[in-house]
Design a protein with these regions (language model features):
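Cys/His-rich short segments
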Residues: 241-310
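Low-complexity, acidic/Ser/Thr- and charged residue-rich accessory regions of DNA metabolism proteins
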Residues: 319, 324-395
């Protein structure tokens, strides 16, 4: 048994997120994508919590369901604090076993001064270590997973406000952190060489701020779809595989300065320095550079702990490419839903559908595009300094 999960999502009550992120729409898109388990997202927001309480029905122990899709109570918290003489900003994914724990978490956050009526991703004036301890005091079944750990400003290991090691961030709570999220700008292999992550399960989720971006990264867990199975899956690395963005498409993959159009590989950064050659301002160090700083030859993860992963380009992007239209064009959206309906969901289309079926339903151009991406035959312009990269089928 296994289940496919996207556990980093947001509701319409999180800043810079689509107003279409309703419970009904999220469930509908999960079916289109082929996702079996979603995070409820943003459970600290009072209006969204009321919608979750009314709409979600108890399912397997610790899980809930809405229109046939399973949900786990989850949210993202932004810890902003000072430690070691530096300002820190670390985003954490938090999961709770039930609504009683959620209410306890909200009460605790309010006591720390967090404004829960605003952003669905509230800011918390506590260290990642202290917040983890407080969460476990509320319910020992709560789980904490550092989010997009390499993002420069908001990642646990980010170049701007992060740390150099897991235990620097979490101290005596490190043993209670079962897993880390790769983020869009890194893939599992990039994380395998980082000694600071040894013994931690590597997971990938979408961090979707809109419905079409749900499932752009996923983790397939072994076991049944229950809260205990999820907890064991995270703690014991019971991951069957992850589905990945091409990390080069992430918006912080390379070092650079977007305003001046400057991007650099790690080798170029070592040679040229960390200031923009055009304006002299500091460059935003990319994820691939930061990974290199923290990787140590001979201290990579146990190969037995490594799990398979598959890099894919979103179907909507492949359709936009083959149809020569923008990804938000109505005709692209109609084609997307028709193909997913006929072939059994986006994940199936991208990973399993045969060439003949792809050609029959989507045309020769789509069949060729999907096949090339599966074979790794792509043309890439890497992202940098907040600008997404592009991935296109080669040729």
């Amino acid at each position: 048994m296994s289940f496919t999960a996207d556990l980093h999502l947001h509701s319409r009550y999180a800043y810079a997120c689509s107003i279409n992120l309703t419970l009904a729409n999220m469930a509908a898109w999960a079916k289109v994508k082929g996702i079996e388990l979603l995070s409820s997202a943003d459970f600290t927001h009072p209006t969204w919590l009321a919608e979750l309480t009314e709409g979600l029905q108890p399912s397997e122990e610790g899980f809930f369901s809405f229109e046939g899709v399973k949900f786990v109570l989850g949210t993202e918290l932004s810890c902003v604090y000072k430690q070691g003489g530096r300002s820190r900003c670390v985003h954490l994914l938090v999961f709770a076993p039930g609504f009683e724990a959620v209410h306890g978490i909200r009460e605790m956050l309010a006591g720390l001064g967090s404004k829960l009526n605003g952003d669905g991703r509230p800011t918390v004036g506590a260290s990642a270590r202290d917040l983890t301890a407080r969460l476990l005091d509320i319910d020992e079944a709560c789980m904490v997973v550092p989010a997009h750990i390499w993002t420069p400003w908001y990642g646990m290991l980010g170049s701007k406000s992060g740390f150099d090691a897991l235990d620097e961030c979490f101290g005596d709570m490190t043993a209670h952190i079962p897993a880390v999220e790769t983020g869009l700008s890194s893939d599992p292999e990039m994380n395998w060489g980082v000694a600071a992550l040894a013994g931690k399960t590597i997971v990938s989720f979408s961090d979707a701020h809109s419905l079409p971006n749900m499932g752009r990264e996923l983790t397939v867990f072994q076991g049944d779809a229950g809260y205990r199975d999820l907890a064991v899956g995270l703690k014991e690395n019971r991951v069957e595989q992850t589905i990945e963005f091409f990390p080069e498409e992430g918006k912080y993959h390379l070092t650079g300065h977007r305003k001046c159009g400057i991007s650099q590989t790690p080798r170029e950064t070592v040679r040229s320095g960390t200031r923009c050659p055009e304006c002299g301002r500091p460059l935003t160090l990319g994820v691939v550079h930061r990974v290199g700083e923290l990787s140590q030859v001979g201290n990579s993860s146990d190969q037995r702990a490594r799990r398979p992963y598959t890099k894919l380009a979103p179907l909507i992007e492949l359709l936009a490419y083959t149809m020569r239209k923008g990804r938000t064009a109505k005709s692209v959206g109609l084609a997307y839903h028709r193909i997913c309906d006929e072939l059994g969901g986006e994940i199936t289309v991208l990973t399993q559908a045969g060439y003949d079926d792809l050609e029959r339903v989507g045309g020769e151009g789509l069949a060729l595009a999907v096949t090339k991406v599966r074979d790794g035959k792509v043309e890439i312009v890497p992202g940098f300094d907040g600008q997404y990269g592009t991935v296109r089928p080669a040729g």
